[in-house]
C-alpha cells in the first residue's frame, strides 16, 4: 500500500518546519563578537623616518622577510588581510608569495644552500577563506569567538614560549619516565625554569580577564609538567588510554552464558583496534631521534619566505606505540583530522562501554523490543563524531585568518634569537621580546647548545650562534596563523560528541602504559580511578598539546580552541535533537567541569 498524498504533504510540511526551527535556534543563540589583542597596529618600525606598523606579532609567513625576520614591505601584509577578508580567489592569487625568482631558471632565490640545492618551490596559504563559508548545521563559523590572544610583552607569552623551548629540548623523554632518575636533571630544570616565571608563580588578580584566569596554571610539578588542564588530564599516566590501547576483536563474544574467544583473536590491549574485520594499529612511525629542524637562521628565513620543506624529515625503520614526546609530535604531524576520536569511538564500541542511560532504547532488547543503530547507536555516533570536525575547522579558520592573525611560535623564536644576538652588535632590534630574552636566559643557552649540535650535524663545521626554537617538522608550522589550533578545535568538538553519547562516568577497570624498553603495553602502577570522560578529555589534550610539542602552537592556542570546538558540537547536538521523535536528553560533562543536558 502506498502512503496517501495528504500524509506525504503533511510530512513535507513537518520536515520544513523542523528545518526552520533549527535555523531559528541557531539564530536565537546570537552572535559573540570577536576582538583581536590590538598588536597588529601596536608595534612600529624603530626608524623615526618610517614609523609604519612592523607587524612583528602577526602571521606573515609566506611574505618576503628581511635578514632579521621582519617583513620587508608592510603593504604586502595589508594586501594579505584585504584578500583573506574578501575571499576573492583572484585577489589571493595576486598576493606576493615567497622571495624573488631567478630570471633564468624561474626558481625562487633562497638564502640557504639547502633550499637552493633542493630547488624548492613555495607553498601557499591553506584555506584562508574557509571562515567565510556558510554551513547548514551548528553555529555559524563567525557567530562564536575566542578571547584575545596573549600579547608578546605579557608574562603569559613568556611562559608559553618557555614551555615550548623546554618541550623541544626534551623530545626524547619517554612519558612513562618523567620521574626516572635518568631524566631527573632535565625534568627538574624544566620545573624550576617554569616555576621561576611570573605566570606560574603569581596567582590571578582581581580584575584579570576571565579568559586569562581560566588559563592560568599553578605550580609546576612532575605530575603536571606539560599536561593539559581539562578535567582528568592530570590524573594517571600522561597518555590517554585511547591513544595506546586496542580493542576486543571479532572472534571474541559472549553468547548466552558462554564466552567464546577465537584462538586467533588479538589481545584486547595490544594496541590493535578492531575496524570491522580489519585492524588499525596505534603504532606510529619513529622519527629520527635528535633530529630537529629550522635551527639555522638562513633555513629559518627561507621557511618564513614560503620554502616548502615538507617531506624532508627522516625516520627509523618500523613503528611503535607512542613512547616519547617526539613520537606524539610525529603522530599529530600526519593524523587524518578526526583519526584519534574515531579510534576512541571504535575502542569504546568494541569494548562494550555502554551508551548514556538517558538515551532511548538502552534497556535489554527483551524490554525495549528493539536495538539501536541508525539513531542512538553505533552508526549514529560513528557518523556524528566525524561530522562535527569540518564545522569546527571553519569556525577556527575564521578566528585564525580574519580576526587574530597571531604569529607562530617559530616566528617568536626568530624574534628572540635575533634579539638575543643583537646586544653583541650594540642594539635591540625587537624590544617587544626583551622580557622573553631576559626571562628565558638559561633555557636559551641550552637551546643554543642543541642548535649548534644540530647545525654541525647538518654540515656546518662552525655555525653562528642560534637561539631559534628547534622544530620537529622540517617545514615548521602549517601555512595559517597560530590562534586557534585546528587540531585542538577538532579535538574539542569530537570528544564532546563522544562524551554526549557514552556513559562518561564509567570507570576504566585496567590502566596501561607503554613499556619503557619494549614495544608493548604493561599494567600501570597507578592506583587511582580513571573514567571514560577523563580519558577522553586527556585524549583531546594529548592531541592538542602534541602540536605544542612539535613547536607549532602555544598553550593558549590549544586551550581556547578546545573550548571553541566544544561550542560547535553542542550547537550541532541542540539542532539535531529537534529531529527526533523520542523523549530524551544528552547528558554532557563539559570541559569547565559542569554538566549540561541537551
From Swiss-Prot:
Please give the PANTHER family that the UniProt record associates with this protein.
PEROXIDASE-RELATED, PHOSPHATIDIC ACID PHOSPHATASE TYPE 2_HALOPEROXIDASE DOMAIN-CONTAINING PROTEIN
Q: Which residues are annotated as active site?
A: 480, 487
What EC number(s) would the UniProt record show? 1.11.1.18
Question: What organism does this protein naturally occur in?
Answer: Corallina pilulifera
What protein name does the entry list? Vanadium-dependent bromoperoxidase
Q: Which cofactor is essential here? A: Ca(2+); vanadate
Q: Entry cofactor note text?
A: Binds 1 Ca(2+) ion per subunit. The binding is important for enzyme stability. Binds 1 vanadate ion per subunit.
Function of the protein: Catalyzes the halogenation of organic substrates in the presence of hydrogen peroxide.
Amino acid at each position: 500500500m502506498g502512503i496517501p498524498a495528504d500524509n506525504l504533504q503533511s510530512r513535507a510540511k513537518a520536515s520544513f518546519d523542523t528545518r526552520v526551527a533549527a535555523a531559528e535556534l541557531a539564530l536565537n543563540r546570537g552572535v559573540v563578537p570577536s576582538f583581536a589583542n590590538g598588536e597588529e597596529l601596536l608595534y612600529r618600525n624603530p626608524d623615526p623616518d618610517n614609523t609604519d606598523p612592523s607587524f612583528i606579532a602577526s602571521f606573515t609567513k609566506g611574505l618576503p622577510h628581511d635578514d632579521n625576520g621582519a617583513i620587508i614591505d608592510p603593504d604586502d601584509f595589508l594586501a594579505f588581510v584585504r584578500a583573506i577578508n574578501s575571499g576573492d580567489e583572484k585577489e589571493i592569487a595576486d598576493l606576493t608569495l615567497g622571495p624573488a625568482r631567478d630570471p633564468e631558471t624561474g626558481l625562487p632565490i633562497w638564502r640557504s644552500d639547502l633550499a637552493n640545492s633542493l630547488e624548492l618551490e613555495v607553498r601557499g596559504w591553506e584555506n584562508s577563506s574557509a571562515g567565510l563559508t556558510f554551513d547548514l548545521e551548528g553555529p555559524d563559523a563567525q557567530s562564536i569567538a575566542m578571547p584575545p590572544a596573549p600579547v608578546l610583552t605579557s608574562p603569559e607569552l613568556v611562559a608559553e614560549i618557555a614551555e615550548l623551548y623546554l618541550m623541544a629540548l626534551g623530545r626524547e623523554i619517554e612519558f612513562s619516565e618523567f620521574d626516572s632518575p635518568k631524566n631527573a636533571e632535565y625534568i627538574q630544570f624544566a620545573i624550576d625554569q617554569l616555576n621561576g616565571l611570573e605566570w606560574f608563580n603569581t596567582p590571578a588578580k582581581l580584575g584579570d580577564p576571565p579568559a586569562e584566569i581560566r588559563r592560568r596554571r599553578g605550580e609546576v610539578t612532575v605530575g603536571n609538567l606539560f599536561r593539559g588542564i581539562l578535567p582528568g588530564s592530570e590524573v594517571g599516566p600522561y597518555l590517554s588510554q585511547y591513544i595506546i590501547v586496542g580493542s576486543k576483536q571479532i572472534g571474541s563474544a559472549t553468547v548466552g552464558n558462554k564466552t567464546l574467544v577465537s584462538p586467533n583473536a588479538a589481545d584486547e590491549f595490544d594496541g590493535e583496534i578492531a575496524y570491522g574485520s580489519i585492524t588499525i594499529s596505534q603504532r606510529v612511525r619513529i622519527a629520527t631521534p635528535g633530529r630537529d629542524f629550522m635551527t639555522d637562521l638562513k633555513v629559518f628565513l627561507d621557511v618564513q619566505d614560503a620554502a616548502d620543506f615538507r617531506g624532508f624529515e627522516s625516520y627509523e625503520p618500523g613503528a611503535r606505540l607512542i613512547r616519547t614526546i617526539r613520537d606524539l609530535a610525529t603522530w599529530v604531524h600526519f593524523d587524518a583530522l578526526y583519526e584519534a576520536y574515531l579510534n576512541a569511538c571504535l575502542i569504546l564500541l568494541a569494548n562494550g562501554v555502554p551508551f548514556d542511560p538517558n538515551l532511548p532504547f538502552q534497556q535489554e532488547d527483551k524490554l525495549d523490543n528493539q536495538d539501536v543503530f541508525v539513531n542512538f547507536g553505533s552508526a549514529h555516533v560513528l557518523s556524528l563524531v566525524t561530522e562535527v570536525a569540518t564545522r569546527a575547522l571553519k569556525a577556527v579558520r575564521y578566528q585564525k585568518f580574519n580576526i587574530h592573525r597571531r604569529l607562530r611560535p617559530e616566528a617568536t623564536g626568530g624574534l628572540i634569537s635575533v634579539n638575543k644576538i643583537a646586544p653583541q652588535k650594540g642594539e635591540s632590534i625587537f624590544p617587544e621580546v626583551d622580557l622573553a630574552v631576559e626571562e628565558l636566559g638559561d633555557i636559551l643557552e641550552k637551546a643554543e647548545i642543541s642548535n649548534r649540535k644540530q647545525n654541525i650535524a647538518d654540515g656546518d663545521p662552525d655555525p653562528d650562534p642560534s637561539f631559534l626554537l628547534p622544530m620537529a617538522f622540517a617545514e615548521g608550522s602549517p601555512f595559517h596563523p597560530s590562534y586557534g589550533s585546528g587540531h585542538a578545535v577538532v579535538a574539542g568538538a569530537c570528544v564532546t560528541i563522544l562524551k554526549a553519547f557514552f556513559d562518561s562516568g564509567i570507570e576504566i577497570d585496567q590502566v596501561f602504559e607503554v613499556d619503557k624498553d619494549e614495544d608493548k603495553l604493561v599494567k600501570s602502577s597507578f592506583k587511582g580511578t580513571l573514567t571514560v570522560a577523563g580519558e577522553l578529555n586527556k585524549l583531546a589534550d594529548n592531541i592538542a598539546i602534541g602540536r605544542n610539542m612539535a613547536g607549532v602552537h602555544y598553550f593558549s592556542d590549544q586551550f581556547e580552541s578546545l573550548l571553541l570546538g566544544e561550542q560547535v558540537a553542542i550547537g550541532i547536538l541542540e539542532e539535531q535533537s529537534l529531529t527526533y521523535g523520542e523523549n530524551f536528553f544528552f547528558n554532557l560533562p563539559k570541559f569547565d567541569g559542569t554538566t549540561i543536558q541537551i
